[in-house]
Amino acid sequence: MACTAMVSTNAFAKEEVKAPAPLLPLPEQKQVDWQRMETYAFIHFGLNSFCDREWGYGDTDPKMFNPKRLDCEQWVKTLIAAGMKGVILTAKHHDGFCLWPFEGNDYNVSKSPWRNGKGNVVKELSEACKKHGLKFAVYLSPWDRSRADYGSPSYVDYFHSQLRDLLTNYGPVFEVWFDGANGGDGYYGGARDKRTIDRKNYYNYPRIYQILDSLQPQAVVFSDGGPGCRWVGNEKGFAGETNWAFIPKNTVYPGYPNYPELQFGYPDGDQWTAAECDVSIRPGWFYHPEEDDKVKSPEQLADLYYRSVGHNATLLLNFPVDRNGLINPVDSANAVNFHKLIQRELGNNLVAGMKPKVSNERGGQFAAQALTDGSWDTYWATSDGVTSADITFTFKKAQKMNRIMLQEYIPLGQRVKKFAVEWLDKNGTWKAVEQGEETTTIGYKRLLRFLTVETKGLRVRILDSRGPICMNNIGVYYGGEDAQLTWSPASVAIKSVPFSLKGFDEAQLTKVVDRNPATVLFADKNELLIDLGRDTKVSTLMYLPDQSENRHGLIHSYTLAACKADGTDEHVLSSGEFSNIQNNPVLQTITFEPATTRYLKLKADRMVNDGEQIGVAELGVK
């Protein structure tokens, strides 16, 4: 009888359902863990914070660094309250100044008056992170404008030794950040010249990756081409609505010239390298007092969250620490309120625990219930060969909703190529929700904002996929009647005294004073002659560059002078460079000692792109 019973039980046993085959390329587990962090912070801090620069030249005296109230615990507590899961510190920016007492040079915090030369910002922040449970990471600029040997093989050895020092003495890091800005003019030990390097090969990245794998194997490596995660191709904080986590292997590298492509990824790429969206809470990356009233609002930050994390990327939000060594209270308040806003809009999942109706189900553990159980590790999947399917939710009574969250189970690859979201009207007709984005890729997470509907039915239609569909979570939310579809920037308002431009008529002049950054005036030479109408006491010139994706006419370095009506007999008021203007084309402000003049000449000593003439979206003098 026992034998008979055993045979009977086996006869009715369910056949095990196999999981869908992985679809290459695939992420490593550390890449999955990194993307699940979603939001984390950047800290830009250094000598630049004290000399009002974005890119230091490499010649600033270390004695200028003296943040008398520096408190890394204040940073960490602020970031945690703002929902950040980690923080990346600029241990060394392009100027070469080190925020830790690196023994390989004399250009570091030990040569500053801060903490009587005994301080170590990297150590203090890493210890504060450990104490409060925030993940820690480091930014190390490959470019070094202070070093005489930059461009030679000996500098590469020096750079590698800095990396080893950071990765050995300050605990585990979740990411190592390599900037794509490499080579150009600089102090270079007093040479004050321009250095050009082979961005792809000079630093010996294969050797760098070996160092990282041996010292911090869990760390994700950031650069334009990863390999752990990639730059999104802009510094505005958003990814493309279509965004693949793939790039072509051995093609994209730090300083990659076709970087605008990176915001979309490559559907035929063979390396998993998801995008990271870096953006500052202020216009600049380092602290500038004049930007205290230009901090992004909670609504602006929320919009960036939807367009970064909600576009299959992560959000890296920069906080410029001020000259006291603290995160400014306005920055702190806006970031915390941004986190509260996201929690409010996405806090109540209307379909949690519901079992949706699906048009296809693989069966076994890959059932539709996995879509709403709140677990990352369970997922719904379709049968082999099924690359489109409908997911339908039915409510007992009508529900208001205006947000949806979709997630693919990315350990098996990114698959969905096209989808749609529909609601059931009172007449029983399915209609597309009203929203402004293309509904193509999903990836780790897709967030869609749409006009509020009140309905008893919601349907997600997966219209095309690279293989069997694998989705692990769906969330539906009502963000409130005041929840925005998107955030639109206000017009650019520049307070200015009246002026005209020599050689340009009224219609052309309008382009630089119309508060519309989309209209751009292009000069026919490399200078602008500004006529104030009469002798006027002025001390500031404001210049907004071309804001388009393929922007032109960007000034790299400039000379501003008072002059005669014909542009001669110059008295130089200011000269310098607009650092990082290509990637972060924010309003550029030139301040100088007050001068009384009728005419000003702004001359481009060097353009970002050789051969181009000056382009101006907005201009002002005061």
Feature-to-residue mapping (PLM):
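Intrinsic disorder/low-complexity signature
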Residues: 7, 357, 370, 469-470, ...
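Structured N-terminal alpha/beta-domain signature
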Residues: 500-521
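Aromatic, loop-rich ligand-recognition surfaces of beta-strand-rich domains
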Residues: 330, 337, 342-348, 373-434, ...
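Mature catalytic domains of secreted/periplasmic carbohydrate-active enzymes
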Residues: 14-387, 392-393, 405-414, 432-450, ...
